[in-house]
Amino acid sequence: MNKYCGALAAIILAAICYAMSRLPTPTPREMAALAARFSFKRCPLPETPDHGPYKMVRNVHPSLERISAWVSSMGAAVTLADLDGDGLPNDLCYVDPRTDLVTVAPVPGTKDRYAPFVLNPAPLPCDAATTAPMGTLAGDFNEDGLMDLLVYYWGRTPVLFLRKKSDFGSSGASLSRAEYVASELVEGGERWYSSTAVQADLDGDGHVDLLIGNYFPDGARILDPKAGGTEVLHQGKSKALNGGYKHVFLWQPALVVDAPAARYKEVKNVFSDEVARGWTLAMGAADLDGDLLPELYIANDFGPDRLLHNRSTPGNLQFAVLEGTRDFTTPKSCVLGHDSFKGMGIDFGDINGDGLLDIYVSNIATRFGLTESHFLWLSTGEVGKMKQGIAPYINASEVLGLSRSGFSWEARLADFDNDGVLEAMQACGFIKGKINRWPELQALGTSNDQIVHNPRFWPNFKPGADLSGHDCNPFFVRGVDGRYYNIAAPLGLVEPMVSRGIAIADVDGDGRLDFVTANQWGPSYLFHNESPNTGAFLGLHLIHPNGSPAIGAVARLGLPNGRKLVAQVDGGTGHSGRRSPDIHFGLGKWEKSEPVRVEISWRNQQGKVQHWALELVPGWHTVQLRNVDALGISTLGAQKTVKAAIHSMASAGGTVRTSEP
């Protein structure tokens, strides 16, 4: 009898443990109700007609041949921006690894305003046999009011493509490669392996600076099939600090005035080696403590991520590493700054409506593969602790239902139905093939750290290998219980894709955010938002008097239900997807004729902190951020109502209003 009681107790205990470990699952009716709020139409991205043959793997250094599919797993990237100056972020700049081309084109469905064209660096030197583009940034790098582009590569340093001042748009002229002048960011012909980049005013002088994140060590020959020797990989699986450097560039006034020119000064030794040489895959910049100096989040492969507190002054860069605190119930790897996961994507957003930015980070969370955990670093609000070196964040991904999905790269937070609550999405997938190589990768994960740096000891990851090559990109929506649920299946977003970057923008000005996924070794797609019955919204194009996007400007507002919303003009946060430099708030059931009080904070182009409170009716507004001191509006309490549009421009589904002090 006792024998049977013991067996029964073991069965009951196992059943209880199983029930406790299962994730809550909504009913089919509840899932259908969540999915009914959203609808997206998929369109392939345009290509140039002479793009050449597709390839499915890169030529690599001979010592890396056995892992050529692994080395070839990055490169797809996309940026959404207003490149042609029509007032809408309806232009694409994307990288297709199948052709190694950087293509600029109108977003599908936004009229054929110009023919797609390739952004090649000629006449600058670029060896196509050993170089590959990895991503792009859009920004006004010479502060002339025109949108420029930056392309970063494996095998060379980044290139600036500066827009010429021309009669484009006034007499039938169209945007083309001839409108851009290629310029070196760095002279000297060094070999960099850049995986990500971000722009922000790092030192608070009022000008936007650049941070380039490299993956493989600087000077390597990763894509040179004729090189000798043996390339070095990560020095360990959980604390690899031998990767490429993070390079910081401070903006400088250009010396040339009669042609497009930009000048940046590289500042050395800004970071310690522990920060500077992680194997970086994603970076983000956002003001997290309210001083309008951007903190930096650096997401690293094979090692801990880094959150850096910005303590800089104009011309003097200074950052301090922040680390989280651990209690009895928190695993070490779920403490900020102590994780050993594979950070691959990062985004900022206020997930709980408390008026503070939280941090969403992608890692690897593959069932039957490598189940780490994604991070949702929820702000505790104790921002004063940053001065003590403490990161005031706790990991809430498991509680919120955002800890698991797949082999994830880009992480994104955005409000796609304008209800005032952010949705979450990720780009997933690693290597697509027919032979499951997870057992071999798991064996590598349990091997001695002393051999991981040598590619001879790695498993066979050549073409044909499969590592999470059939993942679907998740689309998480918050349920009534406060948890997030993946509704990709009922939405029809179930085609497996090996995705890397996600770019978000309202490409047609209708108030509904659209997105583009950049896919590795496959076609990339626009997902046009056709969601029914969306709420009201407030959209802000915040610009300086010269027309440059006010990167780093912060907007805040409150909703009747008590939620506080905050967002910033983003300068490229993420892995390889770049959202447009706009601010978008979903307002829910707000009356569309009722003004919204919004508070804007920014640094002007002299580096002085400015605040301005104004009222705007829902819709898109372009707000020129002038020096409010000269207008006698020096505090947020001095409210100013902005009355209707000084001028308006018709756009598909909406009106773009321009408002000025």
Where are these regions (language model features)?
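Beta-propeller blade repeat segments, especially FG-GAP/WD-type strand-to-loop junctions
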Residues: 29-34, 100-120, 157-180, 222-236, ...
